[in-house]
Amino acid sequence: MFKRKYPNTRLRRLRKNSNLIDLISETNISSNDLIQPIFIKENFKGTEEINSMPGIFRLGVDQALIEVENILNAGVNSIAVFPIIDNDKKDSVGSEAIKQDNFISSSIKKIKDRFPEIVLIADVALDPYTDHGHDGILEGNKVINDETIDILVNQALLLADAGADMIAPSDMMDGRIGAIRKALEKENFKDTILLSYAAKYNSKFYGPFRDAVNSAANLGKSSKSSYQMDVRNKNEAIQELSLIHI
């Protein structure tokens, strides 16, 4: 037995040609790893570029179907859908999120009916639906956790019933993953996958997304710091991850 040291160990042996390098590569990125966001706008036809996301557009549902076909033809097999609803449907509790056959649910059904092979990820959060732009129910200036979870659970069930393959709670309420998983199991959505935003930071990087779903104006100068994480805390992110049970 010899020790792993030069000259018995020559790591350059593994780099002598491109095929060998490919054979032992640790990280490979392909179109199978990509997820294309689709922003679908209610009562809208055509496309509308999102100024803070160059090259990304708000789409009417018919245009979204065309976009999904183009995405599949390009070799990307997964999409994440986000709703842009009419402002007059927004209220303080995001009630439109749990209405049967709401806009995003009907859009998901249309996409899955036409493209059953696409992996469709649906966002679970209330900020596209609330008139204050927060991800939960407000009591005064405070987002209340447990009452928000009740709505998120119903929203998740609605999206699963519409045909979403994966449910992605992005709200950062404590305990929502366990509650949603339990409800999905109870309602026989056992194969629906949960993709949790387990560690979501209160970051300016979310600004373009809020522009995309038209929630930025509703949020105004209000902060999401009471539920999204402080950007300075990495250990807290690990703690959040340890609390996820799905």
Task: Go through the PLM ranges and name each one.
Residues 93-122, 176-199:
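Alpha-helix-loop-beta-strand connector modules within alpha/beta enzyme cores
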